[in-house]
Every structure is written in structure tokens, then in C-alpha cells.
Amino acid sequence: MRRAIAFLMILWYYSNYCMEIARGSGVAEIAWEITESSEYQKRRREIVLGIGRAATREFNPESLYRLVDRYVASGVADDILKERGDTDKAPEDKILKLILKFIQFMPYWICAEEKLESYRNGVFYERNNKIREKETVVSFNKVVRDIISEGQYTRKSELISDVQGAMDCLGYGDEEIENAYKFLAYVINGMRHEIAAEIALRKTKGVRAVYTTGIDDDLAGIDLIVEYKDNYGGEHIIGLDIKSTPDSARNANNSDRDKGRHAIWSGFDHRRGDFGFYEDNLMPSNKAVKRVRSFYETELEKIVRKEVSRHKKK
């Protein structure tokens, strides 16, 4: 009963002050509100007492105490999401839901990123473990993408700074925050190129529809699915893997790839100021979108010719 009342109080706060939160600092502010909730305090107290009872001379509980805040906050965020269900009545509700998902995923995402980095550096891994870590990362990336798309933040530095504030509130150490900065900067850059590509493609001649993909397609290397009608009236479904540079697209296409899936540069160039003079904007300029449309017209026709040629050889 008391637990239900605690959740209702949290939900009441968000429903009454959601507009203020949506215009405020977002992730850090909501993380702080969670840590101030009675449900969070109760869970944390129980876990800390359990750690204290389990501690021995050979086991220093301090290292575990630092982990408690982030996972308790993650659990509370998860429960609030379950309590809310599908209640996106207003844009502010959707933003709140995304930020709660962000806080829910964050400790698992950082752990997954660190493990994947160790695998790249030669640490032995089992294939199933690597797939599981990738699924966690992709799920988190999609939350970041949605937060950017909703316009909660306008600048990359603003979003990263707010996340760092949330991490500080949730007991992360300096080294963990530094690692998260590196991982998050990479994620944000990739997601803003995906969003920019989607915006430009929707305005490109011959493009009938553009769809963002689910986790399975993303893991298979498909970020966007495009319905395209070529210059001769032929209709095509094209899976695109959006890359932030021409070199990364070229390298991806030179590797083994399933047919019908194509890596392509987003067409947006930081050096040209497509994401602002300081490369800090999360959304591309209208001028850049207009320029990139012609780039996609050319690239989509190239992809179609390549696919037609491949089918003729069968």
C-alpha cells in the first residue's frame, strides 16, 4: 500500500510539473527528483544495510555503495514507466518517458560499452555475450535518438553536460563519467547524422517513405528503410546504413554485407558547418538539408543501378 502511494506521489509530481521539467535540464533534474523520492530512499536503505551485513575484512563494501544509486534509480525509473503505461497525452509526457528510459538504461549501457571496448582490445568473449551487449547499446542509442528528435536539447554540449550532471547525482566516479562522455559523444554524433539523413531523404525526389528500424534491423546494419521510385518508374525497398563520413561508408561497403543493404554517407559535413559553426547543433541547418537532397538523388540512383545489375547476373 505504501509503495503504491509513493508511486502515486511521484506520478503526481511529474503530471503537475512536467512542463517545467521539459523546459529545464531534463536528465539531471529528473535523476535528482528520483533520488529524492521516498521509494528510492527506501530501496537504497535496504540494499545498503544488506551490503553492510555481508561485508567482511576481505571485502570492502565501499566499491558496491557507489553502484547502489545508479541501479536503484534505474529500478525506480523502470517502475514509473510501467505505472504510466502508454500515457503520452502530450509532447511533455513523451519527453518524460524517454528521459526515464534513459535513466533506466544508463548503467547497463555504460557496462555494455565498456565490455564491447574490451572485446575490441582483444579480451576473449563468447558470441552470445557480445550480441547481448550490442542489443543493450542499440536500445540505448534509440532512446538517445528519440530524445534528440523530440527537441528536448538543441546542442550536443548541452545534452552531454546534463547527462554528466545526472551521473554525478547518481554516484558515478570521475573515470566512469569520462568514459561515458567518450561513448555518449560518439552515440550522439551517429544519431544526429541518422536524423539528418532521415530529414533530407523525406524531401528527396522519388522517395515515397522513410522508416526508422527496430533493434533487429539495426543489429543487422540497417538504420533506415527507404521506399524509392526511380527515374524509370521502378519501385524499390532500400536498407541504408547511415555513416557520418564518406570513408566509413566506403569501408563498410567493402566489407562483407548482405545484398540489399547499403552503407551510405549521410551527406552532412561538419567542416561545412552543417551542424553549426562549432559543430555543436543536434539538428542540421535548412541550407544543408536542401543541399544534401541532390546528393541523395544521385546516390539512390547509383544503388538502384547496382541492384539491377546484380539481379541481371543471376
Model-predicted segments: where are they?
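Hydrophobic alpha-helical membrane-insertion segments
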Residues: 1-3
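Charged, low-complexity, intrinsically disordered terminal regions
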Residues: 107, 130, 134-145, 155-167, ...
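Catalytic cores of nucleic-acid endonucleases
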Residues: 242-311
